[in-house]
Amino acid sequence: MRSFSFNGVSLSSLGGRITEAPFHTVASRDVEQVKIYGQSGDEVIDNLSYNNVAFSVKIAFITYKTAMSANDIARAVIDWLAPLQGAYYTYTDTWNPGYFTKARLTNFDEVKRELRTLLTATLKFSRVPFWYSNSGAVAITTTNGRLTLTNPEAYAAEPVIKITYTGTATNNFRFSLWINNVLLGYDGIAVGGITPEQYLDGAAKQHYKLSDGQKIYLSNILPPDIPAASASSYAARLEPNTTINGQDFIMSVTPNWRRL
């Protein structure tokens, strides 16, 4: 049986069925053609990114498949989707096993009207360009300061590197992070009692720490992408710039393997 889940809730758990499968297109490259005065032919500007993908799923609910009445079903689905407007949430389906993406529901008002009258609806979504593998969403951790990863996908990945200091020093000190023998940051990165845990987020393009759930920007140091499968491996090396014990560092890399 074909189904999908949105923000962790499966359509089938509500007695729903897909009546028309989504047509999943591959994200297109964000490219512009610009006319230059006096020049024959347009210039092509590659914005180095991909566009969102719009898709729809037609669903129906069968009352004999559940103990709920038709009105209860409509109410349950509306209660499920109503809080999920205006932001991205995790979307999975049975056409892409082992992968997830981030999608936004774009037509809640239409869905609300259709469900209350027909117990059918067409859900329209806008998703981010990539599908992310479940395995790539798992952090790989080391306490010896060294990790080597090889990307299994055909597209470069944007990793999140988390560095945690578990020692007893109460003042910040510095460490160096090397990726494929290239140093990130000339003066090292501060860590210690004041900033015991921090993130270098390749996807969000941010280097930050968390304080009361809020991101606090630390620097412009970012991890490079993990090359695609045909390229070389990705070696991360963490080294304290002082006599602090290297075993007091924990480094983890969430690789975020992805495909279009």
What is each PLM-predicted segment?
Residues 34, 42-69, 117-130:
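Oligomerization/assembly interface segments of phage tail-like spikes and tubes
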Residues 55-57, 101, 121-123, 159, ...:
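Hydrophobic residues positioned within well-ordered beta-strands of beta-sheet architectures
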Residues 133-260:
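Intrinsically disordered, low-complexity segments enriched in serine, threonine, and glycine
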Residues 88-132:
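Short beta-strand and beta-hairpin "edge-sheet" elements
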Residues 66-103:
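Short N-terminal edge-element motif at the start of the domain
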Residues 59-63, 107-109, 127-131, 165-167, ...:
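Beta-strand elements of well-folded, non-transmembrane domains
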Residues 1-54, 97-110:
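Solvent-exposed edge beta-strands and adjacent loop segments
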Residues 49-53, 83, 115-119, 153-157, ...:
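Solvent-exposed loop and beta-edge segments used for protein-protein assembly and interaction
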